[in-house]
């Protein structure tokens, strides 16, 4: 077992993003010293973790020398390498083409940087974000800082590893099937998947027949996540959604909470079942009304429909690769998971229209569920965090069977558009973090953040730097 972190007695200390932003504003630390400390931390842990996709250290130094605006002004961060940053390549976790530098920032990049943080570069992900573990055959795996024998989860792998290891207090992530929440669970972080439409998307994602992808952040504290959504909302607000507002403390309302430990496919592992029920007992102690429910509000054909839609997204990358990425695109360099998903879609294209129709209708079923309950509690994933190698994309069918079993709970909210947050409320017997996922009705991020503040106060998370 090797635990890797960068926490130390430098300008970053062990501050979260809000604390660091406050320290910069008060003049206790300078932007330049903070950015330099984050660069040193990156260089110290990246050889062990493999989370860095592209470094922009010199650009970060130059940016730090300017008096920036925004609440998080001067706070170091990273951006996941599947959205554009002007002047930097976007490789999407693949080496199947020679990258070109982006001409402009993507829509979310502009919003994120407008809140003030300084990006040190881009973080690694699984190829196109399709796998829940970044284990590229040539680029190498992204390892978990709690124990480098284990995966950091995916697809926001590098962001999760770097935030957990103390390189930066907050990093960009996005989620099309669990890619914020799964790394949050694996790395002991707070990971909120917002409601569909809460934050801007680049144009190609807005045109999808089912809008499953959302942007967000990974943090170590609830207040960092809450502060980000408050600041983002001041810059960009969707008038069709209720505002998140300035959530700073637990809510007073006692909630009706349904607890589910079984997905459509299977019961979660015995250990995760017990940890979930332990979290349910904590909720009862806090005065919430908790009820065991046999299964989530999901039809039995949901996993097959989601997998087919996943395959469609892979086919779009494979079949339009030269158009999207240039003439250097070489599909023979794609990993077996991407190619296997493409084949799955091609063989079952006749089923796709009805699958999309059923996915679009799923929100009706969950709306009925949330007419009875305020919140749904499940484990974030169905099994303990796997070791590196378990999800390596060598044999398509084997890795797909393993993936679908492990990520059985997270895709639902991508299809329905509802918000869900993973909180590091537990640890497995081997000492790895375990996330509990809380889902609320569409647009109810504020309710989830209030509950998260309450749980963080009642059961503070384990800290990676304690017990070295």
UniProtKB/Swiss-Prot annotation:
The active site is at residues 80, 155, 179. GO terms for molecular function: amidase activity. The keyword Flavoprotein does not apply. This is Putative amidase AmiC. It is an enzyme of class 3 (hydrolase). Keywords: Hydrolase. It catalyses: a monocarboxylic acid amide + H2O = a monocarboxylate + NH4(+). Disulfide bonds: none annotated. Belongs to the amidase family. Its EC number is 3.5.1.4.
